[in-house]
């Protein structure tokens, strides 16, 4: 029991530091993500009932299935073959360089090189859905 005496203080500190965001930090990140996402609206919509354009509507994309979420949208075979769901790690890879993640994708966007901007967009996308 004595050896575990350090565990409680360690657990208390686990939520401290730069990685521990406050609600305000999260709100700021979502707002930044919304601003960065404006570039995406050249091809994507994000409204609950909005249709697809050159790209699929991204409402509810986070947590949704990859390459099959919008039945009327023509996803590439490469994207369909990925399988699984969009989580933060996969979305980060996709936003960094879609063509590297899925060779043959028809998404013309080259990617978002800045990791913070990608994280901001992912935070925004996570708020846009059920």
Annotate the PLM regions.
Residues 10, 34-37, 101:
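Processing junctions and N-termini across compartments
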């Amino acid at each position: 029991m004595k050896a575990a005496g350090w565990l409680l203080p360690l657990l208390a500190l686990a939520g401290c530091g730069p990685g521990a965001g406050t609600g305000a930090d999260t709100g700021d990140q979502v707002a930044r993500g919304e601003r960065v996402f404006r570039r995406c609206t050249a091809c994507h919509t994000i409204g609950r009932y909005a249709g697809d354009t050159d790209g699929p509507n991204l409402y509810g994309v986070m947590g949704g299935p990859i390459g099959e979420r919008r039945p009327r949208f023509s996803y590439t075979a490469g994207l369909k073959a990925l399988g699984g769901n969009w989580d933060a790690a996969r979305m980060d890879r996709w936003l960094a360089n879609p063509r590297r993640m899925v060779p043959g994708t028809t998404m013309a966007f080259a990617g978002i090189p800045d990791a913070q901007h990608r994280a901001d967009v992912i935070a925004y996308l996570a708020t846009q859905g059920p």
